[in-house]
C-alpha cells in the first residue's frame, strides 16, 4: 500500500510539472506539522491530552513569501439575457434610434479568451499543536483580461438620420468583430485561510483547507481593437449605473459624472489533499472547489473624442460607405460609427473544480520551500518559502 501511494503521488507530481499550469493554492496538507523546530526558539512538541501542557507549547508562528501566478483563469460573463439599446437597423434607409428595445444580450454566458492574475505577498501563519494553521497573506496583485468585443458589449450608432446626433439617440449595432483587453494596476491584496492535518498514518497525511482572497485594482489600460472603432484609454473613466443614452460629453476629457474603472476581485476556495513524506521531500496531490468574481459595476466607457470636430472628425472611426458612391448631405453622420462605448461586465468562474499537484522541500525542520501547479479550472503556478520562528 505504501509503495502504491508513493508511486501515485510521484506520478501525479511529474504529470503536473510537464502539463499545463493553472484558484488559490491548496498547499501541502502536511504544512502544519512539517516545521517542528524553530529558527529562533526551540520547538516544543505539545500534547493536547497532557494536563501539564500550556499554550506556549501549543502555539507557534511561521512566516515567509507567497507567490501565486494564474496564467489562464477560465472565466465567463455574468450578464442578463437581454440588453437595452436602440433597435437593430434594417434596409438601406437612415433613421433615428431614440426608443430603447430589449435585444438578446451577446455577452450572456460569453467565454473570455484569457484571464491572468499575479500575486506576490508576505505570509504569516499561527500554528496550533503542529496540526492546524490559521494564516493570512498581505501583498500586491495585478491582472490582465481579454475577450471578444461582444463580451464587453461594444456598441455604436450607425445609419443615423439628420445633420447632427441628438442627445437621445441610442446605439443600435453590437460590434462583434473585435477584441477588448484590459490591464490593471498593481494594488494591495490580502487573503485569509485555515489548513489542518486531519488524519495521519505513517508518512501519509490527509488534510483540508479554506481560503478567501480579495483585491480591488484599477484598470490601468483599456484597448479596443475593432475594424470600425479602435481606441486605447489609459486610466479609463466611465459611467456606473447610467442607462443609454450616455451624456453628450461622454468620451471628452472634460466629461463630468465619470468614475474610475475599478475591478472588485473576490475568491473563495475549499480543498482537500493527500501527502506522503519521503525524507526531505513531501509530494502531494489535491482537489479544490473555488469561485472567483471580477466585478467592475458594469462601468460603461465611451470612446475618446474631441469636444469639437477637427477636419470634420471627432474620433478616429473609418467611413463605411458600402455600395454608396456619394455622401448624402442631409445625413452627415450616417456612414460613421457614432457614440461608441464598451462595458466591463461582471466575470465569474466557468469551472469550479480543479486538481492540484505539488511538492515541499524541508530543511532541518525549520525551513521549507513549496512549488505547486493547478489544473482544469485554471492554469496556475504557486511558490512559497517559509520558516518557523
Swiss-Prot record:
GO BP terms, alphabetized: monoatomic ion transport; regulation of cell shape
Localization per record: Cell outer membrane
Lineage: Bacteria, Pseudomonadati, Chlamydiota, Chlamydiia, Chlamydiales
Protein name (Swiss-Prot/TrEMBL): Major outer membrane porin
Superkingdom of source: Bacteria
MF (Gene Ontology): porin activity; structural molecule activity
GO cellular component: cell outer membrane; pore complex
Membrane topology listed for this record: Multi-pass membrane protein
Function of the molecule: In elementary bodies (EBs, the infectious stage, which is able to survive outside the host cell) provides the structural integrity of the outer envelope through disulfide cross-links with the small cysteine-rich protein and the large cysteine-rich periplasmic protein. It has been described in publications as the Sarkosyl-insoluble COMC (Chlamydia outer membrane complex), and serves as the functional equivalent of peptidoglycan. Permits diffusion of specific solutes through the outer membrane.
Pfam families: Chlam_OMP
Keywords: Cell outer membrane, Cell shape, Disulfide bond, Ion transport, Membrane, Porin, Transmembrane, Transmembrane beta strand, Transport
Binding partners and assembly: Part of a disulfide cross-linked outer membrane complex (COMC) composed of the major outer membrane porin (MOMP), the small cysteine-rich protein (OmcA) and the large cysteine-rich periplasmic protein (OmcB).
InterPro entries found in the cross-reference section: Major_OMP_Chlamydia (IPR000604)
Family: Belongs to the chlamydial porin (CP) (TC 1.B.2) family.
